[in-house]
């Protein structure tokens, strides 16, 4: 237990000291997104998630909501909408009861973040997921980052849920 806490603390400390690397240019005032554009991007992120992870319609999700260029930062998924489909189609076939419940949606500029409870089945404790999507000017997803953490089987130290 001590080793786990030490490793977690060390990892957090090292991450906090790491330089930030932005793979896309920061927005200027002229490029900043209007509230209506951010609302559109939030709606598109939610619709993409519903199609892909609840209806399991990956083809339609990618066709409607992913741009021609799609950069992926998940180490298990290659760039492109087709790579997303190729990665998740076998997973969804193997886990037909999998569902994703979006708990929070946050937008800033061209970015939308979703805080999600992902489960393989209704009985599964699941995972807490934060997906961050970057949108182009047409409201298409062109870049993706994610952070995934298992939901503990026992009570959390704080007694609060992850959601």
Task: Please name every model-derived segment.
Residues 1-4:
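Positively charged n-region of N-terminal signal peptides that target proteins for export
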Residues 7-15:
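Bacterial N-terminal signal peptides
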Residues 17-163:
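C-terminal and inter-domain tail/linker signature
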